[in-house]
A protein has these predicted regions:
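Aromatic/basic-lined ligand-recognition segments
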Residues: 10-19, 27-29, 95-102, 106, ...
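N-terminal ordered "arm"
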Residues: 11-81
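Glycine-rich, often proline-containing surface loops adjacent to acidic residues and nearby aromatics
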Residues: 36-44, 106-125, 153-166
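Short amphipathic alpha-helical segments
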Residues: 52, 56, 60, 127-134, ...
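Long, hydrophobic/aromatic-enriched structural stretches that serve as scaffold segments
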Residues: 71-128
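"Short basic amphipathic alpha-helical interaction patches in structured regions
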Residues: 128-134, 150, 176-178
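Secondary-structure boundary elements
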Residues: 133-155
Length: 185
């Protein structure tokens, strides 16, 4: 008689795979002809890359530059109260946005996260199977740079997937509720 498998209960670092796969579309998930989607964000958070100094940010941009030629600075994001700082100066390490020419795709990077964003501008939402590989490509570029620099590999602590929808008033809702309720007065 086989012993029953013990269920996994992943903690902050255990049970998380560095491989994310495409969802199974055969399970009956809805698919809209014109989804109200405004933005999709794929992301990973990882243990801070301790030896990733400012010059390495430029080397990472070289990997992204042909597809994302524009760079923007953004305030660092924190998970909790910890902010990554430069060991020598104590200054916060930046979060950079590597943005494509049409401004509808960007890769966000800081020493403890990597995000890929698709944003609605002129084009319709190209769908998950078309944009997920772009996130994977950004992740692969980061991982290859870490190998080239003889740095430790990323240790993923969280995966993120965010869909941001824009649903205009009158198209599915009419009155904003000011409190939790089942009907609005």
């Amino acid at each position: 008689m086989k012993a029953a498998k013990k269920p996994r209960t992943p903690g902050p670092k255990e049970g998380l795979s560095s491989t994310v796969t495409e969802p199974n579309r055969s399970v009956g998930n809805p698919s809209f002809r014109r989804p109200p989607l405004d933005e999709v964000v794929f992301g990973i958070r990882f243990e801070p890359l301790g030896n990733f100094t400012i010059p390495f940010f430029g080397l990472l941009w070289q990997k992204f530059r042909s597809e994302y030629p524009r760079v923007e600075h953004a305030p660092p994001l924190t998970a909790g109260t910890t902010l990554a700082v430069d060991a020598a100066s104590g200054a916060p390490l930046p979060r950079l946005w590597f943005v494509n020419e049409s401004d509808d795709e960007l890769v966000q990077f800081q020493v403890d996260l990597l995000y890929y964003n698709w944003r609605r501008r002129e084009k319709e939402y190209p769908r998950y199977p078309m944009i997920f590989p772009k996130f994977e490509g950004a992740k692969n570029s980061l991982e290859s740079l870490l190998v080239e620099l003889a740095q430790d590999p990323i240790v993923i602590v969280a995966h993120e997937l965010t869909y941001i929808n824009h649903i205009p008033q009158g198209q599915g809702w009419d009155t904003p509720c000011r409190r939790r309720c089942t009907s609005c007065a």
